[in-house]
């Protein structure tokens, strides 16, 4: 389910044409700052869950997330992939309730959770 956080971490990348990467317009967003700020994290999560307003970068993330999940972040920049890993690790270990809400919305049939099962297990703190 690296998918959803992938997108979260991509920090709102823009839709790319086939064969290209998503826009790096938002790659300067400090993912760790977002994760450590309840206000910022809540804003992104509420945007992704259709529970709140979206900032421009939040909207791009929301629009890009389904594609990133479907195609294993194949259009993500290296910075976006790294950010996605950071976000996934944080949500899985520190905010499992948010992870679950996002999973219900973006992976209701557990397709991606099954596809990324090994990766998810590897980030869990035991």
Swiss-Prot record:
One of its GO terms (cellular component) is extracellular region. Gene3D superfamilies: Insect odorant-binding protein A10/Ejaculatory bulb-specific protein 3. It is found in: Secreted. InterPro entries: A10/PebIII, OS_D_A10/PebIII_sf. Keywords: Allergen, Secreted, Signal. It comes from the Eukaryota. Residues 1-18 form the signal peptide. The keyword Zinc does not apply. Its main location: secreted. SUPFAM superfamilies: Chemosensory protein Csp2. Belongs to the insect A10/OS-D protein family. This is Allergen Tha p 1. It comes from Thaumetopoea pityocampa (Pine processionary moth). The lineage of its organism: Eukaryota, Metazoa, Ecdysozoa, Arthropoda, Hexapoda.
């Amino acid at each position: 389910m690296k998918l959803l956080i992938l997108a979260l971490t991509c920090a709102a990348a823009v839709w790319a044409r086939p064969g290209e990467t998503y826009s790096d317009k938002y790659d300067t967003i400090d993912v760790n700052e977002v994760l450590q700020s309840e206000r910022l994290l809540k804003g992104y999560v509420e945007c992704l869950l259709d529970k709140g307003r979206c900032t421009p970068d939040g909207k791009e993330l929301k629009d890009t997330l389904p594609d990133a999940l479907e195609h294993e972040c194949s259009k993500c920049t290296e910075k976006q992939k790294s950010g996605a890993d950071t976000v996934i690790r944080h949500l899985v270990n520190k905010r499992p309730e948010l992870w679950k809400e996002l999973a219900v919305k973006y992976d209701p049939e557990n397709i991606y959770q099954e596809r990324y099962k090994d990766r998810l297990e590897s980030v869990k703190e035991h």
